Amino acid sequence: CEHLSGYINILRGTNNDSAFSRGLCTPAVTVPNGFNFYSPVTNPSKNTACYNYQVNGENNPLDSITVTHAPSYWLSSYGTWQFMANTSVDGSGSVTAAMISSDARKAKFTHENEVAHAHYYSVTLNEGTAASGVKIEVVPTSHAAYIRFTFPADAENANVIFDSLWGTGTLTFGEDGQSFKAQTNHTSAGGGKMYVVGRFDSAWAKAKTVGTKQG
C-alpha cells in the first residue's frame, strides 16, 4: 500500500447477529472526524447495524448507500439519507413509490466485487439485478462525498434513486437539470434535521419527486 490507510478494512466487526456480537461496527467511509459517514446498507430495517457481512447476495442484497451519523450501535443514528443506482426502472414513464422501494431497488452483490476502506468504497452489483452491472464508488470529504456511478454501456436505463428510509423528508430538483436539494427529518438522541445539497456532473434526462422524499 502507498499509504497506511490502505490497510484499513471497514467491514471488520460487521459479522454480527442477535446471538453473537463480533464488533457491532458500522462500515464508515469517512475522513478523520468527518461531519458525515457513508455506509452500505444490506439491512434496511436497522439504522445503526445496517450492514451485516454474513448476509449478502442471495440472503440480503445491497439496498443503498446511506449518509449516517451513528455514534455507536447502542446510540441510534440520525440525519440519515440514502442513494442507490438502478437499471430496472424506465424513468421516462410513470414512476411510483413501489417501483423504487427497498424491495424493488435491492441488488445482489458479492464481497469479491467490493472494496471497503475508510477513504474509498466501491461495489459492483451483480448482472441481472435491479442495478445490473453498475459500479458505485464513494470518496468522502470533510462535509460531503464524491460519488461515481458507472453504468454498463448497454444499460437500457441509468437511474439514481434518492430516499429517506428512516424518517420523513423532502426532495426537490433544480431547474438547471443537474442540482438537487433534500431534507431528512430522521432525528434521534438530540440530532436535528439534516439538509442535503448535491449536483450531478452532467444533466439528467428526467427527474421526478415521488411522494415528498423519494425520487
Predicted ranges, named:
Residues 1-215:
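Accessory carbohydrate-recognition regions in carbohydrate-active enzymes
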